[in-house]
Amino acid sequence: TAANSQVTESLDQQTATAEILRVISSSPTDLQPVFDAILDGVMRLFHPWSANVCQFDGELIHLVATHGGPSEAGRSIRDRFPTRPMAGLTIGRCILDRAVIEIHDVKTAAGLSAATREMAGVRGWRSALAVPMLRDGEPVGAISISRAEAGAFPAGQVELLQTFAAQAGIAVENAR
């Protein structure tokens, strides 16, 4: 039933959130297990085409975890990092604006760079969502997901990705 499905989904979300908190507490100085746990939770709960976690050092964005998309696309995205945050890149705009960026359709969205449209074509995505990881209001990274189909992301996914990003921000602060 729909009620059972909703309960299961809620339990899965709570489990993923608890797992990330467990990893944060067990690896206070090593961020990679945290980023990997976030990516695992995102892939399990959202079933996106691809997902990425990036760290921002104040100057450059570094890809620290990636999953999904065709294997050759994984290489192409790794080749683009580190990079400076630019408004024409989904993650770059997310970091610069310190805001959630949602692209409903890469083919029609305004303000995207040719590189972003090319990346979408290579990786096979049409819609994307990027959420900043903040520490004291300053960007320390971002989490992004993409889907092969165009369209808006459900509000619950946006909120849960924001929760994961907040947890990652705490982990970054703890590691410093």
Predicted regions: what they are:
Residues 1-33, 140, 156-159, 176:
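Signal-transmission linkers at sensory-effector interfaces
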Residues 87-90, 126-134:
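A short, aliphatic-rich beta-strand micro-motif
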Residues 14-20, 24, 30-49, 53, ...:
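Amphipathic alpha-helical coiled-coil segments that mediate homodimerization
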Residues 131-143:
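Short hydrophobic/glycine-rich mini-motifs in sensory/regulatory modules
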Residues 162-169:
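Allosteric cytosolic regulatory segments
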Residues 69, 142-151:
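Short beta-strand-to-loop transition segments that serve as allosteric relay/switch motifs
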Residues 39-43, 52-86, 96:
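GAF sensory/regulatory domain recognition
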Residues 60-62, 71-79, 104-127, 147:
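Signal-transducing coupling segments at domain and membrane junctions
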